[in-house]
Amino acid sequence: MIDQVRAHVAEKIKELDGVVALRQMGDGAVAPYLFRQGDNLSQLTLEPLYPLALTVSLLQKQFPQARLGIVARGCDARALVEMSKREQVDAERLYLLGMACSAEKAGQCYCADPAPDPAQWPAAIVIGEPVASAPPNPMVAEYEGMSLEERRAFWQAQFIKCVKCYGCRNICPECFCEACALEDPLWVEPGLLAPDFPMFHLIKAMHMTSRCVACRQCELVCPADIPLTVLYDLLRRDIGELMGYTPGLVLEAAPPLSLTLEDATIKSELV
């Protein structure tokens, strides 16, 4: 797939101001990079899993007239869908070069949408053969088999490990508030480790309602190995069942929490 991606970037970059992708650096490190025409595309790489949506957002804000491309996995594309709805990226100025993740990669992430949907974008292509949805995270079913008291004990045991490094917030493509409630002393006491249970993580979870696109970066970067995606998978499921909305799925679908109750009717059988 890497050869196909490089070849397509080499062709499309003639029409664009640059393409955001991962670059293999001379010291062996990998970092986001804005490839321009004439750059050495042999340095373009697809691994490791790295979120690029925030990089595109920053570049579009810095260069509002530029037309950029992005080499995007399904999770990147879903993140960009939600960011577009909240005016963090301009979909009209973005060319999406999607790549379909393998069944193995999808399984590692429990990914329900392992390839971008090109139909959602003004200009897009997908390289690779899309695979079926991966099985869901088994920890979710295990959690749902617990009693309420067991669930509380589960989260207490997990959140007590939190060192408040803000890694989950910093990596999240849907966290872009200029003033973060997680840094407000009114809600989160400074210098307290672990943060008060359950305020810190429930504030973030509340803000991610109808936003979380299951990229799982929050869990991957957590130095304490807190299974955050159990919480967010449950949020995504409830929003889907209650409001018929799946974050990151449809570019034109309005986020339910931005609508009135008349426009976003809660399913009566669940009320």
Stretch-by-stretch model annotation:
Residues M1-K161, R169-E178:
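Iron-sulfur-associated redox domains of electron-transfer enzymes in respiratory
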Residues M139-F159, E174-V271:
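Ferredoxin-type iron-sulfur electron-transfer modules in oxidoreductases and energy-metabolism complexes
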